[in-house]
Amino acid sequence: NIKKKLKDMMYDTSVTIVIVSPHIKESKWIDWEIEYCLKNITRKNRTSHTNGIVGVIMKVNGGYDWFKYTSTKSDGCSVSNYYDSKVYDIINNNRYNQNPKVYSCNQCKCVSALTGSYIAFVEEDEFLSNPKKYIDNAYDKSENDADGYDLTKQR
């Protein structure tokens, strides 16, 4: 049974790396895996905690513009934007969910790419150049039991 094997593999983990690809929503399992990793699961008197999650954006045709684009706010701040319809709601609902919000810029109210969302997005090349940075960021969020984030744990 695939679901049982996945549960066994994920139960003792603390960080989940989600590869954000153009075909992510075609998978029958990814949104379920994310939901499972966000829950506290009890087995034999032991409870697993919410995993930290990092979304690694797959490089396609040499770039990331299939999913990510940059815009400039009226105050001059450059911010990353994403085509939200390309990923599952459980991912979108755990983005920009820091509470209370800590703004990188108080004028335009933009947030940090790493801390403004429970599920941070990072480009594949950036992730591969320093995976520890992004895994540690997700791990720290999970170790604090997602404190400071309004989590959506259901698909």
Residue map of PLM features:
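Conserved BB-loop
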Residues: 1-6, 26
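Inter-motif core of Ras-like GTPase G domains
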Residues: 12-18
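Conserved beta-strand segments of the P-loop GTPase G domain that flank and frequently precede/overlap
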Residues: 18-21, 55-57
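Conserved TIR/SEFIR loop-to-helix hotspot centered on a Trp-containing motif
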Residues: 23-40
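Arginine/glycine-rich "motif VI" loop of SF2 helicases in the C-terminal RecA-like domain
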Residues: 39-50
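Short beta-alpha junction loops
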Residues: 49-69
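C-terminal interaction surface of TIR/SEFIR-family domains
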Residues: 62-155
